[in-house]
């Protein structure tokens, strides 16, 4: 047949190229050949009587050379079993307008109604996480690890399934340490990740039709990892790899087609709030003075929010003293536009700046819609609603402050709403315009301050989570989740506020005379007195404490993140990136052989309703050599006394069903500097403080003499004895851990410390599962 000829024919569209083994010039100098001596001629006679010359073949003798490397072999356990852990997970789920959030942090949320997830993720995978996914029925194991306390990791195959309409970009990281920094989330922005040569594009079926519906990636073991047999407890929390993924838009990379501009607009508080931003009760006098200055400025009431916040209060008859003439119409300015009489107002927050307004009611010609009596309503309404909230909530509501009330406080929609009766008469805010394609990042600063901080300046000690010299559209990506992990406060969105400094906005968000000055942005919905997303259902407790926080500033970060290049614009209600994984493991050990004896008299049928046997999977956390019987523990049909004693000393596990973890296991940890660690140490309770102290053998007696003498004077004898006992116990635990590490090194079971998670020492000391 001619099939072989057709198959061997060279294709015409492939250009000719030189094969690497047929190069004209060799890339490496060869070793000189050994010179051979002259061969000796040997003649022999053939059968036909004719002679033919024959050459004797000399055996080539090579030169003995030493081996450049030696192979270190490790004896394998008697029993080995290959296991593939196969499962399916959503790498990320992005709800509407959640592009700037980290899905790994919100993967276990139960908030409803509202959008779910986030547009980027920082996932990590460990053996513990794989077992947790098995308990959630999200994967299956092809072999059991019961009674097999050793393991080897061989890598993983990842399969990413393409979405019909949305593109994604992923990056696989196997280089330790697997920790998040302030640059991790900005580097995952699609505008940044598109410039990374190690990033992989996952195009949608619409962007690249006609190709496979999945993309396969082979990932080896992490760097700095030695392939050998380990106890499963040692590899339980070792990070195998991290997956960085983000949504992207390849069809419209520079702005959504549903908008007519790429410019982002938001509002920031004016400078009158600089020294009055704190919510502490001790600062109430300053807030009261600012509140009086704002309420006396009548042009601020030229907005429809005045009717929404104060008219129901007046119509309900809550204005004191009550009179028949106290109606909403009594607060409206009735002066017609027939006079040019003017009124001068002092702008709040200053003593020298004055504004001249007409006394008429035409707001388009700098008139005031309401008369001067309206200035008394915000305070009365705020005090009335604050007392009502105190009565309803009782002891759970501790602080009653009318300056922070929803209807008439400092941050009421009357002052902060962007919609004014006349656009040239703004409120107590400044409109900011931002073009992402002019941002070079130089001089940009993004940080958070606690709500108790008394000013808007950046402080190296009080301010947290600084991101500088990056474009705002990149710095806003995953910022709130990074702050929650960095500070350890899972309620950070209600306890801190965002501040921005940038010279690339219009007007510039900076003060040349004060380089550390920041500005507090807020969303359009917060200015209109609404919840994020536009809902008017504000909880009663939040109405009593209405002020800008990260919860109300998230929409500003969302708008900044979506303005960057290749950013996803939330055109679909919900999108997800699915992934299949196949982790390859080898379980090993020397288990005791179990003999199963069945009843021979019981009738069994090979056919019928047969149910497949399920595998018995053991938690790798407790699958340690100390908790497993081995062949050397079994002598003469019985277990030895040492094995029984070893098993009795181990703690037993109790099945306690908790409400769930505060943070998902798949979320990566964050890197803490030494300065942040010292600040956090001051907030820890006494046993942990003692645990973090320097051991006695590393501390000199001269340095301790001064501090101990002062402490001993104030403490009683019993307190000193309790503290010394606590120190001795912690010292004993540390010594036992030290001996355990030395023993692992001697057994060749040590793991590179960069592969282990942070905080493992504390968790092991107190025997708490991280």
UniProtKB/Swiss-Prot annotation:
Xref: InterPro entries: TTvirus_Unk
Localization per record: Virion
Start-end of Low complexity biased regions: 703-717
A Pfam family of this chain: TT_ORF1
Location of region: Disordered: 647-678, 697-717
Gene Ontology cellular-component terms listed: T=1 icosahedral viral capsid
Keywords (A to Z) from UniProt: Capsid protein, T=1 icosahedral capsid protein, Virion
Keyword Hydrolase: no
Keyword Cytoplasm: no
Residue stretches of biased makeup (Basic and acidic residues): 666-678
Biased segments, Polar residues type: 647-656
Described function: Self assemble to form an icosahedral capsid.
Similarity comment text for this entry: Belongs to the anelloviridae capsid protein family.
Protein name according to UniProt: Capsid protein
Source species of the chain: Torque teno virus (isolate Human/Japan/TRM1/1999) (TTV)
């Amino acid at each position: 047949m001619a099939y072989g000829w057709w198959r061997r024919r060279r294709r015409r569209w492939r250009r000719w190229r030189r094969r690497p083994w047929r190069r004209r010039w060799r890339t490496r100098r060869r070793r000189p050949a050994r010179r051979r001596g002259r061969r000796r001629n040997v003649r022999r006679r053939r059968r036909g009587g004719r002679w033919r010359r024959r050459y004797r073949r000399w055996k080539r003798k090579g030169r003995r050379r030493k081996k450049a490397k030696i192979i270190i072999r490790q004896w394998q356990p008697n029993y080995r079993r290959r296991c593939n852990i196969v499962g399916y997970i959503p790498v990320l789920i992005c709800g509407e307008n959640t592009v700037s959030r980290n899905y790994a942090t919100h993967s276990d949320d139960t908030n409803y109604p509202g959008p779910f997830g986030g547009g980027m993720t920082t996932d990590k995978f460990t053996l513990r996480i794989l077992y947790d996914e098995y308990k959630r029925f999200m994967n299956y194991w092809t072999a059991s690890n019961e009674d097999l306390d050793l393991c080897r990791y061989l890598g993983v195959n990842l399969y990413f399934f393409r979405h019909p309409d949305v593109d994604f970009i992923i990056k696989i990281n196997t280089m330790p340490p697997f920790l998040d920094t302030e640059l991790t989330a900005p580097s995952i922005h699609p505008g940044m990740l598109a410039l990374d040569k190690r990033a992989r594009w996952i195009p949608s079926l619409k962007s690249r039709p006609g190709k496979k519906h999945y993309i396969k990636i082979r990932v080896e073991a992490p760097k700095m990892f030695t392939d050998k047999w380990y106890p499963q407890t040692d590899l339980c929390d070792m990070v195998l790899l991290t997956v960085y993924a983000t949504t992207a838009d390849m069809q419209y990379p520079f702005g959504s087609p549903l908008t007519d501009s790429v410019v982002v607009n938001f509002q920031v508080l004016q400078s009158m709030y600089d020294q009055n931003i704190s919510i502490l009760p001790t600062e109430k006098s300053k807030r009261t003075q600012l509140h009086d200055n704002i309420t006396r400025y009548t042009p601020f009431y030229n907005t429809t929010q005045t009717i929404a916040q104060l008219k129901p209060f007046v119509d309900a008859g809550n204005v004191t003293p009550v009179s028949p003439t106290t109606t909403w119409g009594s607060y409206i300015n009735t002066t017609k536009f027939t006079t040019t009489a003017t009124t001068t107002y002092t702008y709040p927050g200053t003593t020298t700046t004055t504004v001249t307004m007409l006394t008429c009611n035409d707001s388009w010609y700098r008139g005031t819609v309401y008369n001067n009596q309206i200035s008394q309503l915000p305070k009365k309404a705020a005090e009335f609603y604050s007392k009502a909230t105190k009565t309803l909530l009782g002891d759970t509501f501790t602080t009653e402050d009318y300056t922070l009330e929803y209807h008439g406080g400092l941050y009421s929609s009357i002052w902060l709403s962007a919609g004014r009766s006349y656009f040239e008469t703004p409120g107590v805010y400044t409109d900011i315009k931002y073009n992402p394609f002019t941002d070079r990042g130089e001089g940009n600063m993004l940080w958070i301050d606690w709500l108790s901080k008394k000013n808007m300046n950046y402080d190296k000690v009080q301010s947290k989570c600084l991101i500088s010299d990056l474009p705002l559209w990149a710095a806003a990506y995953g910022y709130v989740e990074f702050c929650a992990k960095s500070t350890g406060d899972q309620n950070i969105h209600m306890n801190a506020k965002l501040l921005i400094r940038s010279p690339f906005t219009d007007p510039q968000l900076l003060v040349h005379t004060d380089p550390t000055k920041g500005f507090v942005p807020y969303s359009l919905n917060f200015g209109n007195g609404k919840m994020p997303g536009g809902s008017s259902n504000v909880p009663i407790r939040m109405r009593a404490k209405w002020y800008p926080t990260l919860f109300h500033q998230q929409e500003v970060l969302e708008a900044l993140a979506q303005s960057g290049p290749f950013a996803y614009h939330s055109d679909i209600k919900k999108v997800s990136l699915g992934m299949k994984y196949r982790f390859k493991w080898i379980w090993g050990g020397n288990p005791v052989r179990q003999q199963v004896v069945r009843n021979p008299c019981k009738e069994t049928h090979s056919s019928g309703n047969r149910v497949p046997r399920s595998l018995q999977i053991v938690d790798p956390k407790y699958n340690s050599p100390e908790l497993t019987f081995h062949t050397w523990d079994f002598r003469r049909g019985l277990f030895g006394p040492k094995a029984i004693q070893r098993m009795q000393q181990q703690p037993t596990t109790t099945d306690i069903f908790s409400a769930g973890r505060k943070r998902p296991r798949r979320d990566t940890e964050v890197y803490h500097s030494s300065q942040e660690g010292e600040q956090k140490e001051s907030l820890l309770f006494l046993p942990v403080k003692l645990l973090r102290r320097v051991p006695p053998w590393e501390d000199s007696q001269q340095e301790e003499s001064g501090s101990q003498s002062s402490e001993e004077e104030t403490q009683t004898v019993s307190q000193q004895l309790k503290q010394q006992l606590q120190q001795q116990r912690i010292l004993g635990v540390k010594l036992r851990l030290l001996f355990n590490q030395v023993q692992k090194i001697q057994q060749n079971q040590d793991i590179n410390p960069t592969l282990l998670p942070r905080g493992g020492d504390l968790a092991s000391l107190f025997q708490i599962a991280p």
